[in-house]
Amino acid sequence: MLKREMNIADYDAELWQAMEQEKVRQEEHIELIASENYTSPRVMQAQGSQLTNKYAEGYPGKRYYGGCEYVDIVEQLAIDRAKELFGADYANVQPHSGSQANFAVYTALLEPGDTVLGMNLAHGGHLTHGSPVNFSGKLYNIVPYGIDATGHIDYADLEKQAKEHKPKMIIGGFSAYSGVVDWAKMREIADSIGAYLFVDMAHVAGLVAAGVYPNPVPHAHVVTTTTHKTLAGPRGGLILAKGGSEELYKKLNSAVFPGGQGGPLMHVIAGKAVALKEAMEPEFKTYQQQVAKNAKAMVEVFLERGYKVVSGGTDNHLFLVDLVDKNLTGKEADAALGRANITVNKNSVPNDPKSPFVTSGIRVGTPAITRRGFKEAEAKELAGWMCDVLDSINDEAVIERIKGKVLDICARYPVYA
């Protein structure tokens, strides 16, 4: 018989210690990785629930197992909330990740070998948008598009590539682009050649939900997102659409199950339902507005301190700092900031002379610090500290001084109070 008082600490001290150390790390480090965020205790409660015990292959009302009457309610709540939040008339909440949601879209809309137009990874795209090491690059004929000299999407080149290569699908979306995408323009280009427009809004879904960033759902044939990142829910994926045919929606459902997955993770779907409800609250909109304000505030300081920011600014939650002129690599910057308890990720910049394992830039995002309660003043102070470290990358005294400031501000703004 299982007893509810069973716990990891008493049973597996080695594992528990690592878990506790990670908890301390999150509280004592400033998190600036653009794809990371802190989810609410309500979401974690759902993920740690007995829903983890239930197999539920199929969809609500059409399961392959019995005993699904309550998990049907859970999944339907998540579906309905996703549709309401993003103005969609179709939602699939089962994908285990954003990449698996993207895989489902590819398999629903395309045949292996079909031509796809996707954003160049080196210009801000994502692995699943056509990287040769990913399924997308291995199974499909990928034609990349990118940004112009100003750091913004080159729509003229995109249109030229589309007319020349006649892709079956055009992908909008990014993992390291700080501008606003013109979804209507992308749909116009897709329609001109009879292609699908598929948008991966994983990075900006929270901003979209709050009305801070344009919603791609009215423009795209299909939209995917993760449920973490700016949306601040559990790690998982989501597929959305509006105005599509029943045939399209059946194809998408079949591409998720049984096409790419078996049983859904019902405890995660419950977490998604909680997060989607939280995203409808007025304070969520305030939070997302602050995310964007904090990113702009940080950019201002980097520019004042003589650092180059790709595209010269940001209109969302992230920005790229180009370190080529500073004779620094992203790897060096990442490591030095890490020693000061500031977590970023090294990132390739446009026309990067370094390999993806070294890079010439860092990506900075504000969802996590804003979740802690940082506003513009704290964001600017933090950006100044980062510049101090990068200006003196081999000076351990400077790094230790900044680390002390980081520990102090983390104590004042805990993740979980």
From Swiss-Prot:
It comes from Escherichia coli (strain K12). This is Serine hydroxymethyltransferase. Pyridoxal 5'-phosphate binds at residues 55, 99, 175, 203, 228, 235, 263. The gene is glyA. It is found in: Cytoplasm. Catalyzes the reversible interconversion of serine and glycine with tetrahydrofolate (THF) serving as the one-carbon carrier. This reaction serves as the major source of one-carbon groups required for the biosynthesis of purines, thymidylate, methionine, and other important biomolecules. Also exhibits THF-independent aldolase activity toward beta-hydroxyamino acids, producing glycine and aldehydes, via a retro-aldol mechanism. Thus, is able to catalyze the cleavage of allothreonine and 3-phenylserine. It catalyses: (6R)-5,10-methylene-5,6,7,8-tetrahydrofolate + glycine + H2O = (6S)-5,6,7,8-tetrahydrofolate + L-serine; L-allo-threonine = acetaldehyde + glycine; (6R)-5,10-methenyltetrahydrofolate + H2O = (6S)-5-formyl-5,6,7,8-tetrahydrofolate + H(+). Changing residue 258 to G: Important decrease in affinity and catalytic efficiency. GO terms for cellular component: cytoplasm; cytosol; membrane.
